[in-house]
């Protein structure tokens, strides 16, 4: 639908932003950034530049590895950053298996249509008391936010309690996410939005490891 709308508006099959009407009407000034403001360590800047240009040397790797810190229990809740979901999932399941307590599985529900690739959390949420978890949705009462970390403190068939890093413990309610379809109305030249389904599940996921993509969204 979005493609049909853009094709109708711009009368072209090229949908690059610089071909938009807004850009064409602007007196666009091009600026190239050359000075780094976030770092003042010249040696570190040189390493970062080599990484960016794919020219990393063995010395660069050694310098970075020298600063690797292996987390200990004293570090508290720490997270492993993974490049892909598959790696993060593997680490999380390994850590979950290490906990010697009863496992509970909470299964989400779908009403209508909701694509699996759009699930905000797992359809089958596997948890144990002591598991490190992350909230995936803001709380309306502002007790936690998307990305808040905690540990599972109590589990029953119908109830999950999580203790946040600040020491506060809450019973976590289920949440529903909505899925929409979009259709372009050529006569009105507008996109029409229609609710097609909902997905209901606890807003939690195992969080010993998360993807870099997810971590960037938390900052």
Which residues does each predicted region cover?
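Conserved ATP-binding/catalytic motifs of P-loop helicase motor domains
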Residues: 1-219
């Amino acid at each position: 639908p979005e493609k049909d709308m853009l094709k109708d508006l711009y009368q072209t099959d090229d949908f690059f932003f610089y071909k938009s009407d807004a850009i064409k009407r602007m007196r666009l000034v091009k600026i190239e950034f050359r000075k780094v403001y976030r770092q003042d360590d010249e040696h570190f800047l040189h390493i970062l530049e080599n990484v960016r240009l794919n020219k990393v040397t063995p010395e660069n790797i050694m310098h970075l590895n020298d600063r690797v810190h292996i987390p200990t229990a004293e570090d508290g809740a720490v997270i492993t950053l993974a490049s892909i979901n598959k790696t993060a999932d593997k680490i999380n399941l390994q850590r979950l298996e290490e906990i010697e307590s009863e496992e509970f599985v909470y299964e989400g529900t779908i009403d209508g249509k909701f694509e699996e690739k759009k699930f905000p959390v797992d359809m089958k949420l596997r948890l144990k008391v002591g598991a490190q978890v992350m909230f995936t949705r803001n709380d309306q009462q502002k007790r936690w936010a998307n990305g808040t970390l905690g540990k599972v403190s109590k589990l029953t068939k119908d109830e999950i309690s999580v203790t946040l890093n600040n020491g506060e413990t809450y019973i976590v309610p289920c949440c529903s996410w909505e899925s929409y379809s979009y259709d372009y109305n050529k006569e009105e030249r507008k996109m029409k939005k229609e609710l097609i389904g909902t997905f209901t599940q606890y807003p939690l996921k195992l969080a010993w490891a998360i993807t870099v993509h997810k971590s960037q969204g938390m900052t």
